[in-house]
Amino acid sequence: MASPAKRAMTRRGFLRGTVAAGCLILAPRRSHAAGSTDLDFPIEDLHVHLDNSTIDKVVPLAKERGVKFGIVEHAGTKENQYPIVLSNDAELKAYVAMLEGQPVYKGIQAEWTDWMGCFSRDALAQLDFILTDTMTFPGKDGQRVKLWLEGAEAKVGLTDKEAFMDRYVDWHIEIISRQPIDLLANVSWLPGSMAGEYEKFWTEARVKRVLDAALKFGVALEISASFKLPRLSFLRQAKAAGVRFCLGSNGRYPNMGQLGWSLEMARTLGLNKSDLYTPGPPGLRAADRRKF
């Protein structure tokens, strides 16, 4: 078995090159965008990981960039390999206590399908929101496969890409319909061998199935600054359907709050405050209103 260092290429590692490549190009626009007055909604980055940073370092950065952060640490069983994985009520409550009183939203990024068994409803009710994505996918043997890792495509049977895409859309719907989530992140991401044919695989019919589920279960879709997803065609269809959005960087220090592409899409779509999700009060959050 390979060492953890060789095996554990996380989303953080996968994104590092993307973020680094985009920072120099977009930094001036991001700085301007965060303080812009042409938008009628507050600028919030609801996909921020502390990982090995600290809240004391992150809060001044949020103030400097004029962006409110939603902190999310990974949550689920210890089988998930990330710098921080919250796996029980005690760990979750300590995390919430650490963020208490700070000018940030308290969230988690839920992992796989078994994360709900790690926490009580009372513990989850202390969060402002719950986020997840679809990038961990069932392999041919039913085990979890992180689709961005080397060798993943063979494990999920990607020889028939259309068949995989149908399963992938089903997976989106299963997660949205069965998990008490408020936000779906990294929306419409595709494995490397498919990413160049985005419009071919994300047909209007497939997009509609995801949007219908998001509307039915009150799940907002992230406009991801790091992945520059969903593409504009998907976003326009989502806006026309009445789906709500949030903005997210998937950033680690010091790259959080860099929302240039997300804000560009918000302007292109003509989004206003009513189109944007913001964490609601107790009773309106997914962990309060959904059965699980």
Regions found by a protein language model. Name each.
Residues 40-163, 253-256:
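A metal-dependent hydrolase metal-coordination microenvironment
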